[in-house]
Amino acid sequence: MIAVTVDGIRVELEEGATILTAAKQAGRWVPTLCYDERQAPFGACRVCMVAVEGAPKPLPACTTPCRDGMEISTEDAIARRVAVSVVELVLSELPAAPAAHTELAQVADRLAVTGEPRWPGTVHEVEHDYRHPYLAFEHELCISCGRCVRACDEVQGAFALTATGRGFGANVTAGLDSGFRDSTCVSCGACADTCPTDAITEITLLDGLERNGSREQRAL
């Protein structure tokens, strides 16, 4: 066992545990977007930055292992500024504010990132994929956190999703970019369950009827 201090709170935990684990044990909130406790830490979003005594710059809490005697601050001004800037950038690429129940909206609210985007500009405009009978994929809401891809790989083992592109052009594709319906998707819903933005959602009976009705009207 090792002991660390998080915002003045001493906690003991197993060697190799991450700073995020220590923060949770201490009852301290650290914002995350790419983290899911059911998956291996990824460290992609850089929202979970914290300050560590002696470290020259903030460190990602989800991938940084604790060291005995480490002193951690989850409310450091510089680390929090990094988190706020990342969330502001993410929101600036979305066509509309995220739904209030999503993790992204809740993180933004707790970080006081509200109102109009700080950096308005080009937003994602990608065609929806409603071809799957049970899952809807609204690409423009994707923030490339990688959680759906890892859920498909690590939890289900279907390997139906792939991260493609870089930077603003990064996205998630199913199969050989042929869509969910024609991929190796087994309709388990793990991707929808972990998505922090509702880019992937499970289709209810009402959703299906509404979408089929829209298609029929367009056909007329």
PLM feature spans:
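Eukaryote-biased recognition of intrinsically disordered, low-complexity regulatory segments
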Residues: M1-I9
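Aromatic-flanked redox-active Cys/Sec active sites in thiol-based oxidoreductases
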Residues: G8, D36, F137-E140
